[in-house]
Amino acid sequence: MIPGEIIAAAGDIELNGGLPTITIEVSNSGDRPVQVGSHYHFAETNPGLIFDRDAARGRRLDIPAGTAVRFEPGQTRQVTLIPLSGKREVFGFRQQVMGKL
């Protein structure tokens, strides 16, 4: 083994396994790119993103931690969302919840 080397176990790693998912269509109506991080409360994203915000309430992107999805101006794409976990309390972001979901 080399110092600092990481030897991963064989097989696949399942991320967010067993969590209920929904897929929604999102359009960027703005003139600037919008990037949304993995743990951002999706319902509170940039108002220039057009999608069903009620369906997205209490959910985040189903992507690896620390990554993001970028929406270019005029772009429409589908994203998969999973429920926020833990205490299911949301504070900050765009201050639209500020408490329990």
Curated annotation (Swiss-Prot):
Pathway: Nitrogen metabolism; urea degradation; CO(2) and NH(3) from urea (urease route): step 1/1. GO terms for cellular component: urease complex. The keyword Hydrolase applies. It comes from the Bacteria. Its EC number is 3.5.1.5. It catalyses: urea + 2 H2O + H(+) = hydrogencarbonate + 2 NH4(+). InterPro entries: Urease_beta-like (IPR002019), Urease_betasu_sf (IPR036461), Urease_subunit (IPR050069). The keyword Hydrolase applies. One of its GO terms (molecular function) is urease activity. It is an enzyme of class 3 (hydrolase). One of its GO terms (biological process) is urea catabolic process. It holds the Pfam family Urease_beta. It is found in: Cytoplasm. Keywords: Cytoplasm, Hydrolase. Belongs to the urease beta subunit family. Heterotrimer of UreA (gamma), UreB (beta) and UreC (alpha) subunits. Three heterotrimers associate to form the active enzyme. This is Urease subunit beta. It comes from Sinorhizobium fredii (strain NBRC 101917 / NGR234).
